[in-house]
Amino acid sequence: MSDFSPREIVSELDRHIVGQANAKRAVAIALRNRWRRQQLDDKLREEVLPKNILMIGPTGVGKTEISRRLARLAGAPFLKVEATKFTEVGYVGRDVEQIVRDLVEVGIGLVREARRKDVQAKAHLAAENRVLDALVGATASPATRDAFRKRLRAGELDDKEVEIEVQAGGQGMPMFEIPGMPGTQMGAVNLGDMLGKAFGGRSKPRRVNVKEAHPLLLAEEADKLIDQDAIVQDAIHQVENNGIVFLDEIDKIAGREGRSGADVSREGVQRDLLPLIEGTTVSTKHGPVKTDHILFIASGAFHVSKPSDLLPELQGRLPIRVELEALTRADFVRILTETEASLVKQSVALMGTEGVTLTITTDAVEAIADAAVEVNSNVENIGARRLQTVIERVLDDLSFSAPDRSGETVVVDAEYVRSRVADLARNADLSRFIL
């Protein structure tokens, strides 16, 4: 769990996302509160529940991007899911408890990665010895092994092909369901896992070059040094105390006014979400998981429905409301120039791989922003995503001919931009064909 202060979290988000100060503050405080809770004594820690967040704002203003960046910062089990993927319990499809099961798998992956780093040195040596066995045989003299070890570490043998024995996974094995426990839940049992445990794991030979063999063997040797049961227990503890779930597109499961009758992927899903967000115990194949202290961040554009169309109980379980503002022309210019991996920097770097030096002038950036604003206002406002469309249109010819123009310098100015997009942006009928 990261111990960044709210100010540090906001400044980290500022590097990638323009504006939306309120949303950044809300998620920063929520993330810091996870750390604060861990500092309390056991009795009080149980009582402190997370304040779940509902982010409301039009499409393309940064809701999903905030979640993506937060996942990297959190250092905790983090899962982003779309609410539209789920159906009510009892119907064909995924039920919402699958969210917790997926979160546990994420947690296990995180903990395993951390444990592998702890045993990296021992595993590295064991993997190196197995590669040497494949190269010179287990019975080779120490002098021969040392000579080959030096060459191996120098990278001289990277392209040499060797045959190694690796653990055979159960990917090709059939799955079967326990009656009454559908496959979307924990009832899908992998026969490969069961047989592997019963017979101590199977291995199969693989022919790969030395460079590819080392990572495969490193992971295998690291796993031998790790207590797998301890990983699962630690992961469940991490998920229960630090887990974060980002529920995107929650507006799509809101009931709409004037609709009648059951809707298994709308109100039914909301009803199923209630106990999950409030706090319940979910059965997983690794054991029961409590959701009382998992932080839920829900987001939606609410174009057609309103937040008040959600079930009142669900609204009550999302106490912190944050509204994100629509982006302006000035925001578009900042997105193109100030963010760490801006679209302009990406385009210049991509053209650089072809040997083309691309220069996009300041007035070109402003012209791209103008075109995006104009098309958004004439057709459909899809926020910052429109910038990708405009840039692709501007650089379309160059992207196609770049391999033939290696060594050239191409300057894109405002006139160049307008000549490519102005007609389409001005004509509302035609601009409907800009996706």
From Swiss-Prot:
Biological role stated in the UniProt entry: ATPase subunit of a proteasome-like degradation complex; this subunit has chaperone activity. The binding of ATP and its subsequent hydrolysis by HslU are essential for unfolding of protein substrates subsequently hydrolyzed by HslV. HslU recognizes the N-terminal part of its protein substrates and unfolds these before they are guided to HslV for hydrolysis.
Protein name: ATP-dependent protease ATPase subunit HslU
Sequence similarity: Belongs to the ClpX chaperone family. HslU subfamily.
UniProt-annotated binding residues for ATP: V18, G60, V61, G62, K63, T64, E65, D248, E313, R385
Ligase keyword on record: no
PANTHER family in UniProt: ATP-DEPENDENT CLP PROTEASE ATP-BINDING SUBUNIT CLPX-LIKE, MITOCHONDRIAL-RELATED, ATP-DEPENDENT PROTEASE ATPASE SUBUNIT HSLU
Gene: hslU
Record organism: Xanthobacter autotrophicus (strain ATCC BAA-1158 / Py2)
GO molecular function per UniProt: ATP binding; ATP hydrolysis activity; peptidase activity; proteasome-activating activity
Highest taxon above the source species: Bacteria
Keywords: ATP-binding, Chaperone, Cytoplasm, Nucleotide-binding, Stress response
InterPro entries found in the cross-reference section: AAA+_ATPase, ATP-dep_Clp_protease_ClpX, ATPase_AAA_core, Clp_ATPase_C, HslU, P-loop_NTPase
Nucleotide-binding as UniProt keyword: yes
Pfam families found in the cross-reference section: AAA, AAA_2
